[in-house]
């Protein structure tokens, strides 16, 4: 019988694919294969594979380039960590000059300056360090808080949110501003006359808070984010409080004269003195210039965002602040959004011809009642479409109104008959509006200045009138001792 191949030799390299293949061939019936022939075939096969270059293992892709960080929600970190310790050293030096190394709220001006913060950050710094619980803060309490702020917040917006806001929150709600603004009332020289009238502290604070959210909270979310603070001028206004003794020059947010105008306008409408107004009260604003259909939309909840339960069919003082700011200055983005929400009946983000006709129908009736022949709706529609130039014919979006720059003219044509007719008369006469006013002042600033002068003159005349009726109800900002209501809380 033929001698079989040396199986033991083949097993010396069992991982060799050629050996495995040879063994498989033998298993399928290798009795017909002569040993010499098989060994020759195996030798030739190995020689061929020995000359082949072993394929290199697959290479991993080249490492990607490191993308530098570009998103800093809390501000860009400082280039040197040592900057934090230097800042802490300045704070510790400030506490060394205080009695017992502790700071009360009255001492926080020195600490705020040592922190490199504006003066009126003193109350937020004090309360963030736990001063409200103990009445004062030690250097250890304050340094522990301030080190965390410096390590996690790297610009003014992030630090302001961290100091005023609740732990873990990335934004500020309205209640967060109350301690800060109360300190402004208590310590700013321009508000010294207001400190004795404690009943009106909450009214002033509520007004300022609503103005802050009206201007800064562009998302209408009810929470001011760090990015919204960065894009606004609010922090610059807070810094300006330190160098501007006349609070009335701070027209963006803090002006007392502006508060006086807003509150007096509300007081004139709130006949029952419950600090709320209903539809009939609001209908008297501006001698009934605003249409009833628009008033219904204001009370529908389209532009009110109170988190607390409200009285049905009532507007709070905070709601009225938004209404008055929007009505008297229709050039601001928030005003455009306010009235657009009111006119967008179906909430689809566009004003259709049906919605425009719905509001103009009452406007035309009110013009006819004043002896003015109104334009047919189709003629007015062509005029406003030419005015706005919407991207989609027959549908006006919020973006269209903001881009055209004539949102005030558009809105007045549909729900404020007095302003619409006054504008038409000026255009026919060829006279510009407010020729004697400051061109840099906003429409709201001009309105507030005119109304404040009128209210002051009205009070002066009432005081000089010896025949003044004692039973009448003049507007008295400080003489409301008979008012039976709680302090107005910011909504």
Swiss-Prot record:
Composition bias, Acidic residues: 460-473, 481-491
- One GO term of the biological process aspect: negative regulation of G1/S transition of mitotic cell cycle
- EF-hand domain residues are 331-366
- Locate the region Disordered: 460-491
Binding of Ca(2+), residues: 344, 346, 348, 355
Q: Which domain of life is it from?
A: Eukaryota
**Keywords for this protein:** Calcium, Metal-binding
Query: How does the record describe its quaternary structure?
Result: PP2A consists of a common heterodimeric core enzyme, composed of a 36 kDa catalytic subunit (subunit C) and a 65 kDa constant regulatory subunit (PR65 or subunit A), that associates with a variety of regulatory subunits. Proteins that associate with the core dimer include three families of regulatory subunits B (the R2/B/PR55/B55, R3/B''/PR72/PR130/PR59 and R5/B'/B56 families), the 48 kDa variable regulatory subunit, viral proteins, and cell signaling molecules.
Record's function text: The B regulatory subunit might modulate substrate selectivity and catalytic activity, and might also direct the localization of the catalytic enzyme to a particular subcellular compartment. Interacts with retinoblastoma-related protein p107 (in vivo). May target PP2A core dimer to p107 resulting in dephosphorylation of p107.
Q: What is this protein called?
A: Serine/threonine-protein phosphatase 2A regulatory subunit B'' subunit delta
Q: Which gene encodes it?
A: Ppp2r3d
């Amino acid at each position: 019988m033929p001698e079989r191949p040396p199986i033991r030799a083949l097993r010396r390299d069992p991982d060799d694919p050629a050996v495995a293949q040879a063994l498989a061939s033998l298993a399928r019936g290798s009795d017909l294969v002569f040993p010499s022939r098989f060994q020759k075939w195996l030798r030739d096969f190995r020689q061929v594979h020995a000359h082949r270059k072993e394929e290199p293992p697959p290479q991993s892709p080249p490492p990607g380039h490191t993308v530098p960080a570009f998103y800093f929600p809390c501000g860009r970190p400082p280039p040197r960590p040592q900057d934090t310790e230097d800042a802490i050293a300045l704070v510790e030096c400030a506490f060394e000059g205080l009695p017992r190394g502790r700071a009360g709220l009255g001492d926080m001006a020195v600490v705020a300056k040592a922190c490199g913060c504006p003066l009126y950050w003193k109350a937020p710094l004090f309360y963030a360090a736990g001063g409200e619980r103990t009445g004062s803060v030690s250097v250890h309490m304050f340094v522990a808080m301030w080190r965390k702020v410096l390590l996690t917040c790297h610009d003014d917006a992030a630090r302001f949110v961290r100091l005023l806001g609740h732990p873990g929150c990335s934004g500020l709600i309205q209640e967060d501003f109350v301690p800060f603004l109360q300190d402004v009332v208590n310590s700013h020289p321009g508000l010294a006359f207001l400190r004795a009238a404690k009943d009106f502290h909450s009214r002033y604070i509520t007004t300022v808070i609503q103005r802050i959210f009206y201007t800064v909270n562009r998302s209408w979310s009810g929470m001011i984010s760090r990015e919204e603070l960065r894009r606004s001028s609010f922090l610059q206004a807070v810094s300006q409080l330190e160098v501007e003794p006349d609070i009335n020059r701070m027209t963006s947010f803090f002006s007392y004269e502006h508060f006086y105008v807003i509150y007096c306008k509300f007081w004139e409408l709130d006949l029952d003195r419950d600090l709320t107004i209903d539809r009939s009260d609001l209908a008297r604003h501006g001698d009934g210039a605003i249409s009833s259909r628009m008033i219904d939309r204001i009370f529908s909840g389209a532009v009110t965002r109170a988190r607390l339960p409200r009285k049905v069919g009532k507007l709070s003082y905070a709601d009225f602040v938004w209404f008055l700011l929007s009505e008297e200055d229709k050039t601001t983005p928030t005003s455009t959004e306010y009235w657009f929400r009111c006119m967008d009946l179906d909430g689809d983000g566009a004003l259709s011809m049906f919605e425009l006709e719905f509001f103009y129908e009452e406007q035309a009736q009110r013009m006819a009642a004043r002896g003015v022949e109104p334009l047919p709706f189709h003629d007015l529609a062509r005029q406003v479409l030419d005015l706005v130039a919407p991207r989609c014919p027959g549908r006006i979006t919020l973006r269209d109104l903001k881009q055209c720059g004539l949102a005030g003219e558009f809105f007045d044509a549909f729900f404020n008959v007095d302003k619409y007719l006054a504008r038409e008369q000026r255009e026919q006469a060829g006279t510009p509006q407010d020729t004697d006013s400051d061109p840099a002042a906003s429409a709201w600033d001009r309105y507030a200045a005119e109304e404040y002068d009128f209210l002051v003159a009205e009070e002066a005349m009432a005081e000089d009138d010896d025949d003044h009726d004692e039973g009448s109800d003049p507007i008295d900002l400080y003489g409301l001792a008979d008012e039976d209501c709680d302090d107005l809380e910011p909504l």
